[in-house]
Amino acid sequence: MRRRTFITTSTAALMAAPAIAQSASQPEYTTTNAAWQAAYDKALSILVKNTQVMPRYSKPVLIEGSVYQGIWMECGPHEALVYRKFRPDVARNSHMCFFELQRADGQLPCNNKVTETGFGQIQMVVPIAATALELARATGDQELLETAYRGASMWDGWLLKYRNTRGTGLTEGFCTYDTGHDNSPRWQGIPPQCPNKDAKYYPEGFKLPRLCPDLSATTYGARKALSEMARALGKTSEADMWAERAATIRDLILKRLYVAEDAAFYDEDAGRQFIRIRSDILSRVCGEHVPDQALFDGLWTRQIHNPAAFWAPYPLPSIALDDPSFVRPITANTWGGPSQALTALRAPRWFGHYGRSAEFTVMMERWCEGLITDMTFRQQMNPLTAEFTRDGDEPDYSPAALVMMDYTWRLAGVVEEVDRLEWNIRPNHAASKGAQFRLPTDAKSTAEVRYSGRGADLTLGGKKLGRIEGLARLITDKSGAPTALLGVSEAPQKVTLRLTGRPARNVMIKANERISL
């Protein structure tokens, strides 16, 4: 019999909710803004279409869509996690398929496509250990927790054996597809795949292997997750071991692959030379929270929020705008410059962590603007014009559809995080025009936001939490108790709080300011 409820451990925070195999109800969003509603509804229809059964695994998973007929480890589990409120079974399957297809030596498949299960590259970005942990924690899925811990531990061992050939302790890249940076100048001249489709080997003559900051960051994020998993499973000594190993590789990334004078992370080739191209490596390293706040603040000023570099009109380009390697003109499926839907989908994993929720609002609005204007949901767009690449890139790409869905809720609805609910109140926004949001929570309650006039009414499980007028994010615990108000606009906002059981309160809140309640 499958056990789907966590055993009792000291990590009570992981025991938040019982498991659910199939969603009893799905999130609901309606608005009188016809254009926004049409884009949102089309995004959901694409995700339904892209929920398919692939060969060699018997249950439905969320595939990449467009020209990509399969599920990839670098992104598929994370995408399905974002989709979990609609299809928790698909979120689970999109993790378990990789563990079921894992080889006895620990190697995880890089993908499972219609044509084959791939082992020709490691292709990892968002750690499957991290997304599996989040899903297991949210749904109380003991079997997933145990399976993911075992599988991700074996994968770490495989990487240490076959992707640490230089003995540095950092994770090595052997080919272009290892990082999924197709057609990027970062990998110019390097074969796309490992010889004979075997990720244990690298081609000779290209100054390989490389020490890769982003692959190493993925390993770091996975080890942090493994530490939490071990603690939840009562394996205290193993939890400490994984935490120590995580700290070690983080330290190596910062000491060996960060160049302070450029405020950039670079690959180091086998000749110990940096590949000095400012690329999407940066967002991926931030995605696993490798930089501390002080280092991030420098990266933010010099690179990420610099309009000449990565803060394009439609962020974030895959190569800095002012980097001479930026590929022009833009071609299909290239990480040589365009803003990629995958990067946008991963952004919530780090913008808020580093205290940049207000600026993230701008990015979300720009992406939704581009998607609503285009309506074909393709892979990449010109960071200067929002024009989506058409020649060679097909429509109905799952990450683009997920961006539209996820950003709608993050802009003007309610979002459930690991330990809290975030109520994003944004009256007079295109997404909130006559809008209603209904979100089933992991505790089998329903969180609702209903807009009217200059604000919105908030309820949880039929109980009124209050009303907010003005633009801000109310943060509550899972039971709805208010804990903080966050400024999520770049301009100061006047906000009126009418919270149940408390006197009305007027506040002025600045960008990214956090007011305890």
For the regions a protein language model found, what residue spans apply to each?
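C-terminal beta-sandwich/jelly-roll accessory domains of carbohydrate-active enzymes
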Residues: 453-517
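Aromatic-rich carbohydrate-recognition surfaces in CAZymes
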Residues: 69-76, 80-95, 99-189, 212-216, ...
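N-terminal export signals
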Residues: 5-23
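C-terminal capping/lid segments that line or modulate ligand- or cofactor-binding pockets
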Residues: 71, 124-138, 261-303, 333-458
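Extended glycan-interaction surfaces of carbohydrate-active proteins
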Residues: 30-70, 93-118, 165-210, 251-339, ...
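Structural helix-adjacent loops and short alpha-helical linkers that scaffold large soluble proteins
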Residues: 28-37, 83-95, 135-153, 167, ...
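Acidic/polar, glycine-enriched structural segments that form the non-catalytic walls/loops
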Residues: 20-69, 142-144, 153-160, 230-241, ...
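Alpha-helical scaffold segments in carbohydrate-active enzymes
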Residues: 42-49, 97, 151-165, 218, ...
